[in-house]
Amino acid sequence: MCLFIETIRIDHGRVCNLSRHNRRLNDTRAHFWPESTPLQLSDYLSSPGCGAGITGAGIVKARVVYGEKGIEDLSYSPYAVRHVHSLALMQADTIDYTYKSAGREPLNCLFALRGACDDILIVKHHPIYFILHTLSEFNIISNKRNGSTEYGHLVSLN
């Protein structure tokens, strides 16, 4: 059974980037299960109950696990900022994380090889672009056009 995840920031009861999370969830479901009915995360993430019971919950992380049948699991935890001071570069052209699979074994294996570094940057080469992405909060995308490289595209995963 294929399961996927959405990790959503909830700031004092306000669900952040809800439309982006809805789009990614429904795009994933449409790709794997074309006959699936679109879901609305707002039906599951009711604002007054978001993170209820989390001690000192100003910012909460919701973890939504979903699959063919819909939402399989929903959990809340306190949001904690991870401070990253060092990165290990890992080339992994065969890892495909286009869809946020709940099965993170290949990513966890790379993370285990980081040594003394706080996190990793995964480097994937492609004829048009290469992508670097960390396991924490951001994807970093760099496009190659006409022999030059553009840097600075930072895409939040939240």
Residue ranges and their predicted role:
Residues F130-H133:
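Short beta-strand/strand-turn micro-motif
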Residues M1-I128, I141, N146-L157:
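Conserved alpha/beta cores of soluble small-molecule-handling proteins
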